[in-house]
Amino acid sequence: ALIVVGSIVDIAITEVNNAEENSRISITFFRLFRVMRLVKLLSRGEGIRTLLWTFIKSFQALPYVALLIVMLFFIYAVIGMQVFGKIALNDTTEINRNNNFQTFPQAVLLLFRCATGEAWQEIMLACLPDKKCDPDSEPANSTEADHSCGSSFAVFYFISFYMLCAFLIIDLFVAVI
């Protein structure tokens, strides 16, 4: 009964002091009664309390899964920058100005696109050998006219990344929640 009376007093004071900017009565104390109604509801239901407790406990393991995902993206982005960072940008392929391994943020964004399953096969095919190199990435004293970029490592790289994201990471994330 005390919680209901406190809530009614809170609503009444809020309505009365709504027009006044400088109210003398601090109504923050009465707002605690609204929270107490929720606590009272949770204390009655054993199932709701168990569900809430499980939900809170699962959030304790969530940062570790997030850290694992960040580490996976970081490692694969650095490897991708080293192996595929010199591929020339071409708007007709999947390696273009929006999707490339030339900078770290672009590499992470490209990996996020692959992790969601959006055209990762085409990106993999665009990173295979015999692709043109970016003219800005070649050394000035390079004499090779047919210098090609890309690597056969792309097949292992993209399939392993997709498998880790699709099966291991997503399953861990769902298992924690």
From Swiss-Prot:
Catalytic activity from the UniProt record: Ca(2+)(in) = Ca(2+)(out)
GO biological process, alphabetically ordered: calcium ion transmembrane transport; calcium ion transmembrane transport via high voltage-gated calcium channel; calcium ion transport into cytosol; cardiac conduction; regulation of cardiac muscle contraction by regulation of the release of sequestered calcium ion
Intramembrane region list: 107-125
Post-translational modification: Phosphorylation by PKA activates the channel.
Key word Transmembrane present: yes
Keyword Calcium: yes
PANTHER family xrefs: VOLTAGE-DEPENDENT CALCIUM CHANNEL TYPE A SUBUNIT ALPHA-1, VOLTAGE-DEPENDENT L-TYPE CALCIUM CHANNEL SUBUNIT ALPHA-1C
Protein name (database record): Voltage-dependent L-type calcium channel subunit alpha-1C
